[in-house]
Amino acid sequence: MTDSKNIIYINNKKVEVTNVYHDITLLDWLRNYHKITGTKEGCAEGDCGACSVIINKKSKEDSKPINSCLVRLGQVIGSNITTIEGLGCDKNPHPLQMAFSNEYASQCGYCTPGFIISGVSLINSGKVINNDTINDAISGNYVDALVTLQ
């Protein structure tokens, strides 16, 4: 364990990381220590995207989606992590959250946060949004999500 105080920003809120093993996954730390449960564990191998969060180490332009089930807490010290809870809320959802709702694109909803995180990350990247970049952002996902992201 560490006795030093380390900082991570979760959804733009400063969080001190103390007395936690830095080799715990970011996913487990979010869910078990902070009750941020929108980020899910599906496969624990980084293939399904249910655990996706956006990491921002330096600037918004530096942000990218990561699989929180594969990343250790110690690797993200000093970073800003955005989870599905940080994108919007019931009264003020992110436009992509609203689009998923309006298009009935969530199926059971378990992996929907990962789709939305990947989509928001693509939108924020400044890349041209077309079928290729959407497919890259959400590779392996189903047609309704693809149509919604377009």
Model segments located where?
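Signature of N-terminal electron-transfer/Fe-S-associated modules in redox systems
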Residues: M1-Q150
